[in-house]
Amino acid sequence: MRTDLFDFDLPPECIALRPAEPRDSARLLLVRPNVGVEDHSVRDLPGLLAPGDQIVVNDTKVIAAQLSGRRIGGTSEPHIDVTLIKRIDGSRWQALVRPARKLSEGDVLRFGNEGRVCLLGNLDASVEAKGEAGEVTLAFAFHGPVLDQAIADLGAPPLPPYIASRRAPDDKDVGDYQTMFAKNEGAVAAPTAGLHFTPALEAALAARGIGIQRLTLHVGAGTFLPVKADDTDDHKMHSEWGTVSEETAKTLNEARAKGGRVVAVGSTSMRLLESAATEDGIIQPFTGETAIFITPGYKFRAVDVMMTNFHLPRSTLFMLVSAFSGLDTMRAAYAHAIAKGYRFYSYGDACLLFRNAGAAS
């Protein structure tokens, strides 16, 4: 399928640089294929769903994946910016570095400065391997929980490029870029649809008889990458690690058997649930990597409703929502959102999507 079909123009002023406060005051666009759109607030969510429905959120926790350091040794010590993108093992990470041309295999990086070091001193890493487009493998001097703490001490929130290019991350982002469900560390980007939830909204959902179930998918930096191929068949999807517990799978299967719906909060929950489901729609316990790439024509097995933010043009995420509710439906919904001043991307507003009848398995 041609990727230019998923392109659209977005005025820069539509990009949210800060989240709504309080979080559940964000706007919510209800999208029903073949019915139309309605303007709501996230606080209206309980009334837009039914008793017995089950909401599924991602409880991954964003790490402070943005590191600033310098190459040590040699005749100069150039400044290097590093974004951690995927853990390899207890001491090694895949990362994106800038400027990559300043680094070679075997170089050593030192993070922090005289006024900012972790408790154990300097955090060093060697460049173990160098790939394309600024990607490297870094082997850190620390291991396991000690390394995790050092990264937390020295790192900053890894804001998406469309925010970071317009302002620097600050202390407010430490809390803003984390969902209330965040528990299991490992993401380098937030599961942003979950940012809209508050304890008050959670209580209102419970009072309506709507459950909230949890899974974990560690969101990678690939979520921000545009699709550069001219055809979706030629795009290589990034891989992310996730897990669906036996308890969550059982609860969701029982709910659907009784007529309840599975409501995926965000593309990460959606992709993991679809990866865990059998062809007949039974959700199985799952632990491992998923590189599922969902485009129009995909038959959804596990998810009936989706809550998600507004996505970048020509992104795998816009392709996913187009597969779920229909490309024409989503193009019309996004045009409405732009005209009505909805806020886009990670800190922006949300939409509640119902599945196109033709997208069911």
Curated annotation (Swiss-Prot):
Taxonomic superkingdom: Bacteria
Assigned EC number: 2.4.99.17
Pathway: tRNA modification; tRNA-queuosine biosynthesis
Matching Gene3D superfamilies: QueA-like
GO terms for MF: S-adenosylmethionine:tRNA ribosyltransferase-isomerase activity
Main location: cytoplasm
Cited InterPro entries: QueA, QueA_dom1, QueA_dom2, QueA_sf
GO biological process: queuosine biosynthetic process; tRNA wobble guanine modification
Gene Ontology CC terms: cytoplasm
Nucleus among keywords: no
Compartment(s) where it occurs, according to its Swiss-Prot or TrEMBL record: Cytoplasm
Catalytic activity, as annotated: 7-aminomethyl-7-carbaguanosine(34) in tRNA + S-adenosyl-L-methionine = epoxyqueuosine(34) in tRNA + adenine + L-methionine + 2 H(+)
Keywords linked to the UniProt accession: Cytoplasm, Queuosine biosynthesis, S-adenosyl-L-methionine, Transferase
Function, in words: Transfers and isomerizes the ribose moiety from AdoMet to the 7-aminomethyl group of 7-deazaguanine (preQ1-tRNA) to give epoxyqueuosine (oQ-tRNA).
Family: Belongs to the QueA family.
Subunit structure: Monomer.
Protein name in the entry: S-adenosylmethionine:tRNA ribosyltransferase-isomerase
Annotated organism of origin: Afipia carboxidovorans (strain ATCC 49405 / DSM 1227 / KCTC 32145 / OM5)
Taxonomic classification: Bacteria, Pseudomonadati, Pseudomonadota, Alphaproteobacteria, Hyphomicrobiales
